[in-house]
Amino acid sequence: MKRIAICPGSFDPITNGHLDIIERAAPIFDEIIVAVLNNSSKQPLFSVQERMELISEVTEHLPHIKVDAFNGLLVDYASTVGADVIVRGLRAVSDFEYEMQVASINKKMNDQIETLFMMTNNQYSFLSSSIVKEAAKYGASVAGLVPPAVEEALRHKYSEGELR
């Protein structure tokens, strides 16, 4: 049976921390779907399409990676695409508390889907998309925090006057 996992997130934008988790999860599964949450209640810097394109570009070196977008409940999406594992990266104990609650609710809604927690590499334990956007907004270098393609996309966005 084919093992399909989902790495879900907003990815606004994808960071080296996200990429680290995806790269480390890739050899464990036959296929990984990097699933971009289309959350209409948020005002993202990058559109869903832009985020999907950036993720595709920075994961092109990895076999068996697909990029998709979803709305609604993650467990419903997982069932739709035939995934039986949700991969979540954890930076700190504070992440674990929230993620454990979400995993428990997901398990209650669909007991066929497991959640796999992976600890982030120490060098990315402080990293978030919000921190990256805040730094980039004020012209600080985000080299080493995001892949070069994302760094360029951020530079382009903020040179156009996007100040979210």
Swiss-Prot record:
Keyword Transferase: yes
GO-annotated biological processes: coenzyme A biosynthetic process
EC number of the protein: 2.7.7.3
GO molecular function terms attached to this record: ATP binding; pantetheine-phosphate adenylyltransferase activity
Catalytic activities: (R)-4'-phosphopantetheine + ATP + H(+) = 3'-dephospho-CoA + diphosphate
Residues annotated to bind ATP: 10-11, 18, 89-91, 99, 124-130
Listed CDD domains: PPAT
Cofactor: Mg(2+)
Annotated site residues (Transition state stabilizer) in this chain: 18
Pathway(s) this gene product operates in, as recorded in its UniProt entry: Cofactor biosynthesis; coenzyme A biosynthesis; CoA from (R)-pantothenate: step 4/5
GO annotation, cellular component aspect: cytoplasm
One Pfam family, short name: CTP_transf_like
Keyword annotations from UniProtKB, A to Z: ATP-binding, Coenzyme A biosynthesis, Cytoplasm, Magnesium, Nucleotide-binding, Nucleotidyltransferase, Transferase
Annotated disulfide bonds: none
SUPFAM superfamilies: Nucleotidylyl transferase
Record's subcellular location: Cytoplasm
Binding site for substrate: 10, 42, 74, 88
Classification via InterPro entries: Cyt_trans-like (IPR004821), PPAT (IPR001980), Rossmann-like_a/b/a_fold (IPR014729)
UniProt similarity note: Belongs to the bacterial CoaD family.
Function summary: Reversibly transfers an adenylyl group from ATP to 4'-phosphopantetheine, yielding dephospho-CoA (dPCoA) and pyrophosphate.
PANTHER family per the UniProt record, alphabetical: PHOSPHOPANTETHEINE ADENYLYLTRANSFERASE
Quaternary structure (record): Homohexamer.
Protein name: Phosphopantetheine adenylyltransferase
Organism listed in the record: Exiguobacterium sibiricum (strain DSM 17290 / CCUG 55495 / CIP 109462 / JCM 13490 / 255-15)
